């Protein structure tokens, strides 16, 4: 990773493999959150979603689902069939921060 990019991060990334649902413009997509932080996520998905799009992420944690509003900050081509999207979370709920703390404590 480019040092300049890592210095620009608002918070540390935690490696994950979590299935998520993405809602964008009346469409529903499946993705995998490959890392999470207090301010964003990287999600692998077989669907292209335009940068600057606002999306909703449904993140299953234990017996509940977190509904997170986010904005696509970047896209990255990973292969012929998969893209990665970097998202910025918009006003995540308090229980999302609890989820991140649980991930950090399990490292």
Language model feature labels by segment:
Residues 1-36, 98-107:
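N-terminal helix initiation/capping motif
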Residues 14, 49-51:
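Short, well-ordered loop/turn sites that connect or cap secondary structure elements
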Residues 16, 29, 55, 66-68, ...:
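Hydrophobic core residues within well-ordered beta-strands of beta-rich domains
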Residues 18-22, 53-65:
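Short conserved beta-strand and strand-loop elements enriched in small hydrophobics
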Residues 22, 35, 72-74, 91:
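A residue-level detector for short acidic-glycine micro-motifs
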Residues 25, 38, 75-80:
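Short, conserved beta-turn/loop elements at beta-strand boundaries and strand-helix junctions
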Residues 31-32, 67-75:
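Short beta-strand-centered aromatic/proline hotspots
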Residues 42-45, 78-89:
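Short, solvent-exposed secondary-structure boundary/capping segments
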């Amino acid at each position: 990773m480019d040092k300049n990019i890592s210095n620009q991060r608002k918070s540390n990334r935690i490696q994950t493999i979590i299935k998520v649902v993405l809602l964008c413009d009346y469409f529903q997509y499946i993705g995998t959150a490959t890392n999470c932080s207090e301010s964003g996520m990287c999600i692998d998905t077989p669907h292209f979603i335009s940068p600057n799009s606002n999306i909703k992420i449904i993140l299953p944690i234990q017996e509940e689902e977190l509904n997170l509003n986010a904005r696509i900050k970047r896209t990255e081509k990973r292969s012929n069939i998969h893209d990665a999207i970097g998202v910025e979370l918009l006003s995540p709920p308090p229980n999302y921060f609890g989820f991140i703390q649980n991930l950090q404590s399990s490292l």
